[in-house]
């Protein structure tokens, strides 16, 4: 069974990055499916072995996962708040998540979101009250403060392009 746990960990970690929580859940789920008469203690032992194997081979690193996921999410237009929340859901502790999102530029991320959704400076249609409410609500749902949302909403296209052209950390 330990060789199965090792091979399963190798397979999963070679496909994509995982957090400790994700690997533990995947091994637990698959062990219950594969070994019908396995007990809870054995399942936990297999999961712990797989996690230890991942750490021992430097294939499992929550800090690195948090940094990569943060950069990707920022490029996608996600707010600092949304990124942090998503990391915690994935199993990253709050302190590590806070460190990972410390350098996120919410203004830049909001401009990326505006470009993706054709809001604010990238708007292609005439602005009316309904559209204004929709755009501002969208920024709020994405986790941006009302100040950031309003700033991007009122921004000129040239200013938005300038924000986007600035280097990302």
Q: What annotation goes with each model-predicted range?
A:
Residues 1-169:
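An alpha-helical, amphipathic repeat domain used for nucleic-acid recognition
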